[in-house]
Structure formats: C-alpha cells, structure tokens
Amino acid sequence: MISKKKKRKKKSRYKRLDYVSIKANKTLKSRSGWEYAYFQYLDNDINVKSYEYESLKIPYLSNKKTGKIRTYIPDFFVTFVDDSKLIVEIKPKRFLEKLQIKKKINAAKEYAQKNGIQFIVLTEDGLKLLNLI
C-alpha cells in the first residue's frame, strides 16, 4: 500500500491586514502593523494627494558574477499636493545591514535621483517620531 504524504499548508511570513484606503481608492493588504499604520498616516495627511502600495518596480543587480537582475518593489509611492513624489520603504533597523537589502536600497536611491524623486527608509525610529508605533 502506497502512503500519501499530507501536504502542509504553507504559512504566510506576514500577517496580512486589510485596509480600506481613501486616497488609494481601494482595499490594500498590508504586510505588517507598521505598514498598516502608515496607510492611516497617509490617508490623514492633508499634504498627500495620493499613494500607491507596492506598485513601483525597480530593477537591480542581484549578483555581479552571474549578472542576475531582480526586481525591487518598495512599499509606497506617494504623490503630494504640490506634485512632488516620495518612495518609502518600511524596514526594521536590524535588516538594513543585510546585503540584499543594501542592494535594493541603493537601486531605489539611484532610481529616485535619476527621476527627481525623494526616497526614504522608515525604521522603527522614524515611525516613533511620527507617533505611528
């Protein structure tokens, strides 16, 4: 008799939280409580005209030896009422020293500079300053 192995359900790495956004005009699924709090912050900021969540795609060189190109998707792309733009990545400080994260951040900085856009990484320190955590 052949035994069948039960497939385990793959658990998500993130607790996805639904958020109904006024300015994005749709329901968004955050990957963390920090992102959820930032949704609320953006919706309540009168200087924010609109924002998109995980919509921007930035190519970056993942491996110099193989030439492997990957795609980095920052958390937020914000447009302000004065039409200035901002790319935001929300990341715990402890992850900022990881090589892949550094590559993604450098790619976002280059992209932002070439396109006249600001780029910031919001860690727990920045979120505390905004009273979001």
Write out the residue ranges for each language-model feature:
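Electrostatic, structured charged patches in enzyme active sites and in nucleic-acid/phosphate-binding
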Residues: 1-133
